[in-house]
Swiss-Prot record:
Pfam families, per database record: DUF445
Keywords: Cell membrane, Membrane, Transmembrane, Transmembrane helix
Localization annotation: Cell membrane
Name the record gives this protein: UPF0754 membrane protein BPUM_0927
Keyword GTP-binding: no
Organism from which the protein derives: Bacillus pumilus (strain SAFR-032)
UniProt-listed InterPro entries: DUF445, UCP032178
Length: 377
């Protein structure tokens, strides 16, 4: 009975000591959370292992993650995988569809982003920009001739239309002088001509009479205007003048006919019929829906590919600038020790219990061996 009691006692004591030792060792991984002092001296094993080495652990985890887990090569491989491309492409398609369904106007959308009266600002910008652009162009081509400024096809087109212009002028002249107004104007011109000639004019008017003179001159003028030689003469005259005008520089044209002022007037007149409000006061979806199919088929794949390539090329530098290892280290250092302890225990609770039981088993086994030695010796 004494031997059995000794065996049982030593086995129980050994098991309790072994289990308690392992349990205490597990607890000492985290506890105590802070150092304790006695007579100004820090007590051993305070704080626990992980609290004491937390800064070093945080630093090593950060280095481990960046050098072996979150590497640029691994992220690039993930980025450039077909699955990632398809997922990004589907996301872009959803955004396009969402844009096509937007009923808010462009003006209202811009106002949401802090851009008020965008139409007025756009019109003002357009007017100022067109003024600067036109002034720059006029200055640039100031010394060039009209022949140099006009495209060859335009110059040839104008030259080919000169006979038509001469014919039109003569026809309008015939039409005018055949009218009562034209005939009356012709009579007034004859009267003025004769008055300027003094006595000689008076004598002619006395012999022929004003009506007789008009009746004689009027048919001759119409005949002159209908004559083919007159048309040829006028055509040649217009051609000669056109050749002269083509050699004028832009500055010379402006000096003679204020063409620069005319250019500004034409520009102003054209812009007066255009307002960006007509464009900006429409729903965003009306614009997106018109090009949604083309955006999905042509633009989206190209943008996704180029975006992934650009991101991959810039990834290594970006990760270096972001310093993820420092972020990981800082987060681990700020993570509450109690939460960390609960997290580790919740994950490995069964394994930690088995370690405690193993300590008890080994302690009991050692106690049994000691009991044998005590009994025998």
């Amino acid at each position: 009975m004494n031997i059995f009691t000794t065996f049982l006692f030593m086995i129980v004591i050994g098991a309790v000591i072994g289990a308690a030792t392992n349990h205490l060792a597990i607890k000492m991984l985290f506890r105590p959370y802070k150092p304790y002092y006695l007579f100004g001296k820090q007590l051993p094993f305070t704080p626990g292992l992980i609290p004491k080495r937390r800064d070093e652990v945080a630093k090593q985890v950060g280095v481990l993650v960046m050098e072996h887990l979150l590497t640029p090569e691994g992220i690039q491989k993930r980025f450039e995988s077909s699955e990632a491309k398809q997922e990004i492409l589907h996301t872009v398609h959803r955004l396009i569809d969402k844009g096509a369904d937007m009923e808010i106007t462009v003006l209202s959308l811009l106002e949401r982003f802090g851009v008020s009266h965008a139409d007025v600002k756009a019109d003002e910008w357009l007017h100022h920009w067109s003024d600067r652009k036109l002034a720059s162009l006029l200055k640039k081509y100031n010394e060039q001739t009209l022949s140099e400024l006009l495209p060859l096809e335009v110059e040839n087109k104008i030259s080919s239309k000169i006979p038509d212009a001469a014919d039109y002028i003569l026809k309008r002249g015939i039409h005018y002088f055949e009218s009562e107004e034209g005939k009356a104007r012709l009579g007034n011109m004859i009267d003025d001509f004769l008055k300027e000639r003094g006595m000689l004019g008076g004598m002619v008017q006395m012999f022929l009479g004003n009506s007789s003179l008009i009746d004689r001159v009027h048919p001759e003028i119409i005949k002159f205007l209908r004559n083919a030689e007159t048309k040829k003469f006028l055509t040649d005259l217009l051609v000669q003048e056109w050749e002269k005008v083509k050699q004028f520089s832009l500055q010379e044209l402006d000096d003679k006919w204020n063409v620069k002022e005319l250019a500004y007037s034409v520009k102003k007149q054209l812009l007066s019929h255009f307002s960006t409000k007509v464009i900006l006061d429409k729903p965003v979806g009306s614009y997106v829906s018109e090009v949604a199919v083309d955006l999905k088929i042509y633009l989206a794949p190209v943008l996704v590919d180029k975006g992934i390539k650009a991101a991959s090329n810039a990834l290594e530098g970006l990760l270096a600038k972001l310093k993820f290892e420092d972020i990981i280290r800082e987060q681990i250092e700020l993570f509450p020790l109690k939460k960390m302890e609960e997290l580790v225990i919740s994950i490995s609770n069964n394994e930690l219990k088995m370690i405690t039981f193993l300590g008890g088993f080994l302690g009991g086994l050692i106690g049994a061996i000691q009991a044998i030695f005590v009994t025998l010796f």
